[in-house]
């Protein structure tokens, strides 16, 4: 026996991530072959034998798997301070992106290297990307083709020099052809120079911001030259449209996300922007290298909101404000039109920075699929080590309707009928949502290994949605192990519009797949639930001397969930917002702190 290949009990324990007592017990039972070496007769283990056992431990049928996976798998019970998103998560906008370091900590806590992590509602792919960074394999599922496109493009292996070469070629060709569409005149010297920003009021340009090579940045009222340029590009637009050269989507905007009178996707852009975008799209389509083509399309689609009419403007300063801050297609009365050349170059630089950050990532570790999470037919039963996901919140975010803004430019086919959402315009009601989410949790239960964990984040205060989600988990056979209120890295668009009434964090629910529990899960709705909720809130408000909406909901919702206090005595789901308004007062208060006087709102006992 070669002593160089022999490991001590401690070394084996570290290799297999189990205790030394477990190693000794497995050796005594014959599960781990061992050798008595030297006068001391200490146990020694052959490294080849240990590698074979390690493979067994990772396999779904291993008798050791249960004890192995429970080793150090302690449910997280504290808030993890979120960190800002690194560059590779800023490559493309997507809703509900979770703090990468929080997701990473959960993956590290519940898995080991080589394990398989599943996210059946993948979104922007944080779970899959963080899994790859940690040398875990992963499966990402999303019915939205835009989600799949973003994640695959983010993790794809591309030659950076080739990417840079194609970008410059396309950019220069487009610039030579259309740069004059952004021509304006410097108010100081009268020289022709390039416009950076136009500020519109309704359908009329009010201000122009440009840059002169001699006099630098300037702001001016629109003049006759600028008006002549509008006539020029509108004539060009009509000419190209008549000859069939222009190709852009004219799809109707879905009713759920429609706002401010725009009926079609193309109405969210100026004619000048449509000329540029149509030409740019055609150039990208001609690229043969699929990964390069997709990455340039990622630059293209990530730019679309920034060059649309949805960016609020400031007439006096001739600048733009943060755009698309609400989950609707809204064109403000005063809006901006930005220079597409500038925006395309900025998006290229952002995406290049993100790709450089992920240069060492092994893209083969992540398997990404465009499919329905309620039918995971391509995943074997009991094969997944851990699930971390962020399920759709009923009607909170219309992912598919909003992604239509991008999907239609890329000609993606979308299965709207299978979307998990509440949308009365599409006859997608609560019953449909609850049924689909329940089927998804059944599939998650099926593919997860016994005694392994599922974590999901949730951010909603409608008890109907909580009831559908949590009962879907329990009916599938999962056992609730704990709830954590997790701070968010950044506020959502909804929070930005309505800060005083929204939750500031996400709940992270941790469930365990208990073997043979699928037919044993029982629960009863609490009787006198409304009285229970009111009394619980009253005690909380008295103790805290009032609470904000966020503090109140973040306190009461987990209590309601744990006690199944969803329904009133008539069996109807409680409208918790109405119940709170009926029994408590919402008052404006003045706060004094080191920054001076500030206003706040809080709930108090009547």
Describe each model-derived feature in a short phrase.
Residues 1-25:
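Polyanion-binding surface elements
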Residues 10, 33-58:
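Short helix-start
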Residues 17-42:
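Major-groove DNA-recognition helix of helix-turn-helix-type DNA-binding domains
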Residues 68-118, 134-380, 399-426, 440, ...:
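Nucleic-acid modification enzymes, centered on SAM-dependent nucleic-acid methyltransferases
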Residues 121-125:
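Class I SAM-dependent methyltransferase "Motif I" SAM/SAH-binding loop
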Residues 392-443, 451, 455, 459-464, ...:
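Mobile active-site "lid"/loop adjacent to the S-adenosyl-L-methionine
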Residues 523-526, 567-606:
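Charged low-complexity interaction tracts in eukaryotic proteins
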Residues 549-557:
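A short acidic, leucine-rich amphipathic alpha-helix
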């Amino acid at each position: 026996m070669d002593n160089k290949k022999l490991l001590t009990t401690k070394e084996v324990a570290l290799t297999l991530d189990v205790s030394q007592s477990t190693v000794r017990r497995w050796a005594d039972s014959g599960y781990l072959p061992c050798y008595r070496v030297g006068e001391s007769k200490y146990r020694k283990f052959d490294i080849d034998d240990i590698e074979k056992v390690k493979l067994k431990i990772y396999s779904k049928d291993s008798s050791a798997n249960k004890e192995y996976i429970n080793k150090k798998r302690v449910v997280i019970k504290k808030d993890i301070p979120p960190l800002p998103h690194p560059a590779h998560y800023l490559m493309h906008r997507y809703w509900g992106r979770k703090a990468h370091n929080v997701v990473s900590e959960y993956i590290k806590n519940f898995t080991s290297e080589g394990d398989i992590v599943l996210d059946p509602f993948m979104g922007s792919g944080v779970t899959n990307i963080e899994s790859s960074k940690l040398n875990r394999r992963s499966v990402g599922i999303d019915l939205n083709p835009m989600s799949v496109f973003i994640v695959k493009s983010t993790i794809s292996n591309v030659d950076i020099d080739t990417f840079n070469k194609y970008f410059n070629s396309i950019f220069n060709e487009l610039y030579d052809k259309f740069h004059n569409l952004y021509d304006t005149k410097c108010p100081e010297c009268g020289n022709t120079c390039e416009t950076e920003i136009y500020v519109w009021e309704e359908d009329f340009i009010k201000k122009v911001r440009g840059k002169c090579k001699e006099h630098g940045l300037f702001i001016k009222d629109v003049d006759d030259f600028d008006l002549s340029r509008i006539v020029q590009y509108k004539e060009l637009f009509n000419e190209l449209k008549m000859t069939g050269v222009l190709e852009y989507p004219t799809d109707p905007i879905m009713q759920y996300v429609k706002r401010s009178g725009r009926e079609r996707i193309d109405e969210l852009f100026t004619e000048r922007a449509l000329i540029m975008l149509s030409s740019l799209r055609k150039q990208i389509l001609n690229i043969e290298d699929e990964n390069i083509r997709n990455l340039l399309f990622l630059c293209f689609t990530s730019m679309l909101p920034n060059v649309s009419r949805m960016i609020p403007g400031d007439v006096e300063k001739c600048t733009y404000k943060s755009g698309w801050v609400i989950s609707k297609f809204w064109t403000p009365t005063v809006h901006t039109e930005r220079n597409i050349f500038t925006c395309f170059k900025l998006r290229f630089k952002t995406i290049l920075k993100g790709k450089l950050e992920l240069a060492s990532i092994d893209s083969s570790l992540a398997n990404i699929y465009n499919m329905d999470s309620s039918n995971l037919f391509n995943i074997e039963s009991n094969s997944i080590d851990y699930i971390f996901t962020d399920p759709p919140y009923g009607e909170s975010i219309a992912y598919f309707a909003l992604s239509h803004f991008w999907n239609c430019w890329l000609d993606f086919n979308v299965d709207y009928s299978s979307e998990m959402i509440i949308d009365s315009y599409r006859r997608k009601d609560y019953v449909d949502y609850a049924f689909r989410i329940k089927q998804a949790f059944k599939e998650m239960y099926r593919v997860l290994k016994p005694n392994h964990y599922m974590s999901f984040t949730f951010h909603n205060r409608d008890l109907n949605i909580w009831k559908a989600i949590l009962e879907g988990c329990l009916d599938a056979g999962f056992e609730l192990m704990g709830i954590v209120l997790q701070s968010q890295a950044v506020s959502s668009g909804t929070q930005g519009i309505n800060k005083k009434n929204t939750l500031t964090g996400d709940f992270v629910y941790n469930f365990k797949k208990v073997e043979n529990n699928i037919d044993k899960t029982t629960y009863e709705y609490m009787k006198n639930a409304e009285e229970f909720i009111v009394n619980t809130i009253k005690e909380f408000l008295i103790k805290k001397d009032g609470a904000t909406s966020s503090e109140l909901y973040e306190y009461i919702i987990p209590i309601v969930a744990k006690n199944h206090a969803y329904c009133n005595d008539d069996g109807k789901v409680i409208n918790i917002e109405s119940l709170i308004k009926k029994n408590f007062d919402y008052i404006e208060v003045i706060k004094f702190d080191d920054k001076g006087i500030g206003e706040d709102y809080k709930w108090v006992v009547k």
